[in-house]
Amino acid sequence: MKKVESFELDHTKVKAPFIRKCCVYEGGHGDKISKFDIRFLQPNKEAFGTAAMHALEHHLAYNIRENLDGVIDISPMGCRTGFYLSTWGDKDPIEIKAAVETVLRNLLKSEDIPASNEVQCGNYKDISLFGAKGYAKDVISKGFSLNIYGE
């Protein structure tokens, strides 16, 4: 049975917040896709409220593309402690950190949530800009580490 990369991570040893380059996949034609773990909250100790996480997802999805080339997708983790980011190419975590922090600083100045309406979102009523700003402010003050063990 093939292993799931994220399940191989010892969640008891990591120190959030951090940005981790999980892997680089190489396709049959030499194309590369990088996958990143953007961890806001300490695993098994904290979890996003769904409305705040939903607003963070909308802001990240909408605005990360303005700050980073080659974005394929950014998706919330099922455990509600962070997001996965997939990009074309072999990206450097420093570049990812800069882009994510820029989006979060801009979120703090935002007065609305992109695509938070019935047409563009499947659960637009469960979304909180106030909650998203709280998480953004907290992670900006702590800073994302590029060392998952906090050293």
Model-predicted segments: where are they?
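His/Glu-rich zincin catalytic helix
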Residues: M1-A52, L56-I64
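Extended aliphatic helical segments
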Residues: V4, V14, V24, V71, ...
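Proteins with a high burden of low-complexity, intrinsically disordered sequence enriched in S/T/G/P/A and R
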Residues: V4-S6, V14-P17, C79-T81, E95, ...
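Intrinsically disordered, low-complexity regions enriched in small/polar residues
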Residues: L9, R20, G27, L85-S86, ...
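Generic recognition of cysteine residues
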Residues: C22-C23, C79, C121
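Short, flexible coil/linker segments at or flanking structured domains
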Residues: E26, L41, V71-D73, S128
